[in-house]
Amino acid sequence: MSTSKLVVAMDGPSGTGKSSVSRMLAQRLDARYLDTGAMYRIATLHALRKGVDLTDPAAIADATAGLPWSIGTDPAGEQVLLDGEDVGEEIRGDAVTKAVSAVSAVPAVRELLVAAQRRLAGEAERIVVEGRDIGTVVIPDADVKIYLTASAEARAQRRNAQNLAEGRGDDYAAVLADVQRRDHLDSTRAVSPLRPADDSVLVDTSELGIDDVIGRLLLVVSERTGAGQ
C-alpha cells in the first residue's frame, strides 16, 4: 500500500452508515480519521450546558468562541473531550441531536470549527475526514471525494434500530420525521448547505451492507490515487 499523502473527504446525510464506513475505510487505508460531526456536537453540548438560547446566533457564537474541547483521530476508538471530560456518549443523546443543526448553522461556529478541521487534516499524513461539507468547503482539494446517500426511510430504519439496541425505545415515525427535518435544515442553510461536490463519487447505501460499501470505496480510492489495494 502507498504511504504517500492522502486525504479522503466523506460527506453525506446522517444515517447512511457514514461514520462506521469512514472508520473502517481509514483502518483499511492505514489512515487517521476525523469525525467533524462530533466537533459540532461538542459545540452544541457546550451551548446547551451554558443554557444558551438556540434561536440566538450571536449568543451561540459567544458561547462557543473559547470552546474547551479536543478530539482524537484514531479510527480504532473515539476520544472527544469537553472541559477534560469524555463526552462521547452524551454528544450522541437526543438533546444534542435535536439542537446540533441550529448550532452548526451559525457562521461563527462553522468558521471556528472549519479552521480546526483543516489544521487537523493538514497535520495527518493520511486521513479520512467525515462530515457534510468536507469536499465542498473544508477540503475542496481532497484527493478523493465520496458522497454517501440513502433514502430517508432506510436511514430512519437504521437509526431506529440503533435506538432499540441502545434501549431508547421504538418510534420509527418520530425518527423518520427527525431525519426529514434535519435533511431540510442541512440542505437549505445559508452557510455550507449539504450537497455533493461536483467531483464527488456518489454511493447509495440503501441496499448495501457495510462490507459491500467498503469494497466499493477501496476501489474508488485505488482508481483515483493508486492507494487502497
Curated annotation (Swiss-Prot):
The keyword Nucleotide-binding applies. It is found in: Cytoplasm. Keywords: ATP-binding, Cytoplasm, Kinase, Nucleotide-binding, Transferase. One of its GO terms (molecular function) is dCMP kinase activity. The keyword Manganese does not apply. GO terms for biological process: nucleobase-containing small molecule interconversion; pyrimidine nucleotide metabolic process. This is Cytidylate kinase. The gene is cmk.
